[in-house]
């Protein structure tokens, strides 16, 4: 067979373990895996690199269109360039922050139009479950190709902005789950108790307690666990498949494992920042590290890592949710925007912290960044290095420490809690459907080969 390109000399993570094999690429697909595949028009030398499936980040916020309200936030151009530089070849875009929120056919088509010609990586879409669009919106989104749905139990959205996202009440959650169950797709849920966290935050602010530690204390662990239990009950009642996003506590994971044992179709993810940062250092870092649910105590880090390593947590995401710098420029944690810019530093941080520091097998690494999200969200052509799959790869150089600087970031706004951190591995090349979209020496390709899925 004549290949368009062949990857040679790398340690390739396959589904049955890592091997020093060659990978032949034809028409954007993996066409062969083996030894001595021959020559081709192009040889991609992976010497010194670990070749992994490109990351599928299942939790990313892009704010385009901005609707005249958020036009200066992260858009498709910079967001997907950062993804490429970070080894992310596909991400699933959340239905909020953009204006209007993605809740029906009109809004998702507006989003597709806004992103046309701007994508460096592939982008799948979430549709939103909101109280104001329970009459037809879910079905319209299904017809327009969303891979899953998303709702919030925590308070969200700006009521002064027409068409902005809104959290669900119990009836909207129940009715939405019944409708989504009929599509066969997954409902991903931000599980925090809105009434309690809002009130505790209000009390702390009135008492002048505005530090990040006070913010964390206003969102205690039980305010994650309680809504997870409710979601499990609703899932049993409606038959809706569910997924808990950005889980930050071991107790919540354990509730999900119990439900799985009872036959509930439920999974969960955590985020890189919950496996890296900890409460005791937050005020030193500043509001750039504020997120929801909050980052918890250092004593919980290994408990969360153990649940990643044993498979209780299915995969890891960034929950990339950047904003303009002014929304982080405050000493009042309750007033700062709650979101972390982390899309570019999933692969390197997770490889360093998981593989290099905690002896995570390479097959498990590939599973948590690519294979498992591909399976959960039915991205059938993605997620593993196997014949017939899309030729999506990230090349990782192990034991290659570097200090992240602001100028290294491809985001629109160069703000991230990872700035100044020494990271012990590097992404050196990213390939999307056979096309090199990032190379450490050449930089990010200006060729916009990404596309919306489907």
Swiss-Prot record:
Catalysed reactions listed for this entry: (S)-allantoin + H2O = allantoate + H(+)
Post-translational modification: Carboxylation allows a single lysine to coordinate two zinc ions.
Any GO MF annotation of the entry: allantoinase activity
InterPro entries, alphabetized: Allantoinase, Allantoinase_bact, Amidohydro-rel, DHOase/Allantoinase_Hydrolase, Metal-dep_hydrolase_composite, Metal_Hydrolase
PTM annotation (N6-carboxylysine): residues: 150
UniProt entry tagged with the keyword rRNA processing: no
Cofactor notes: Binds 2 Zn(2+) ions per subunit.
UniProt cross-references to Pfam families, sorted A to Z: Amidohydro_1
Binding site for Zn(2+) 2: 150, 190, 246
Record keyword Hydrolase present: yes
This protein's UniProt keywords: Hydrolase, Metal-binding, Purine metabolism, Zinc
GO-annotated biological processes: allantoin catabolic process; purine nucleobase catabolic process
Complexes and interactors: Homotetramer.
Protein family per UniProt: Belongs to the metallo-dependent hydrolases superfamily. Allantoinase family.
Protein name: Allantoinase
Organism: Bacillus licheniformis (strain ATCC 14580 / DSM 13 / JCM 2505 / CCUG 7422 / NBRC 12200 / NCIMB 9375 / NCTC 10341 / NRRL NRS-1264 / Gibson 46)
Gene name tied to this protein: allB
